[in-house]
């Protein structure tokens, strides 16, 4: 799409009369879970054929950063990257069709440092998580995301989330959240979020 003008105001090789139509250069999948699918088939035909041109990854969990344990997949094949940036570059290297962007997942940071234990992060773990969040921002993350309705993300305290959000805020990063509750604790979840 080069220009949007009233009919007959522009001479061009191709002119499309979009009167009474919605015009978009492409749709954005803001909650994309296609990372693994893109590793298998980068063409992303299902979304591309629906007009999706940008896949936003990383809701809660992300391609990185990964520690040695996290890199070993269930199929025993090691993931060939460590950082979020390397994971995104891996997808680009496969020649994926859509544009991709990613949040760094707060769950990924927590598992990297705390594992799956239901306990508060120590001060040292929080500082390392903040450093990993900053590194992900420097590698191109658009912000940090949480999925607080799922374990082990729900083990994180509000203070932990605030500390991580402050780290990405240093880079003008965004914060998005799948809140802790969508039911009986909805108001409390909204209070925590806002």
Q: What is the predicted role of each segment?
A:
Residues 1-26:
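Histidine-rich, glycine-flanked metal-binding segment
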Residues 6, 60-62, 149, 179-181:
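Short, ordered loop/turn segments at secondary-structure junctions
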Residues 12-13, 97, 170-172:
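A general structural motif
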Residues 13, 35, 66-67, 155-156, ...:
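Short Asp/Glu-rich motifs
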Residues 16, 69-73, 160-161, 190-192:
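Short low-complexity, flexible loop/linker segments enriched in glycine and/or proline
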Residues 21, 28, 32, 38-143:
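Divalent-metal coordination cores built from histidine and acidic residues
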Residues 26-37, 175-181:
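Histidine-centered catalytic micro-motifs
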Residues 86, 120-146, 152-194:
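Histidine/acidic residue-rich metal-binding segments in metalloenzymes
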């Amino acid at each position: 799409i080069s220009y949007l003008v009233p009919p007959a105001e522009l001479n061009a090789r191709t002119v499309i009369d979009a009167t009474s139509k919605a015009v978009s250069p492409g749709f954005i999948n803001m909650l994309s879970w296609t990372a693994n699918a893109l590793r298998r088939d980068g063409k992303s035909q299902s979304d591309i054929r629906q007009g999706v041109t940008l896949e936003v990854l990383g809701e809660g969990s992300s391609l990185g950063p990964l520690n040695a344990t996290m890199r070993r997949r269930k199929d025993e094949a090691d993931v060939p990257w460590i950082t979020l940036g390397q994971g995104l570059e891996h997808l680009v290297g496969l020649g994926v069709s859509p544009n991709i962007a990613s949040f760094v997942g707060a769950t990924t940071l927590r598992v990297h440092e705390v594992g799956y234990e239901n306990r508060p992060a120590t001060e040292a773990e929080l500082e390392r998580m903040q450093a990993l969040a900053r590194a992900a921002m420097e590698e191109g993350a658009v912000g940090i995301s949480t999925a607080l309705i799922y374990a082990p993300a729900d083990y994180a305290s509000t203070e932990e989330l605030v500390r991580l959000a402050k780290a990405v805020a240093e880079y003008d990063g965004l914060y998005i959240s799948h809140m802790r509750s969508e039911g009986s604790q909805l108001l409390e979840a909204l209070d925590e979020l806002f």
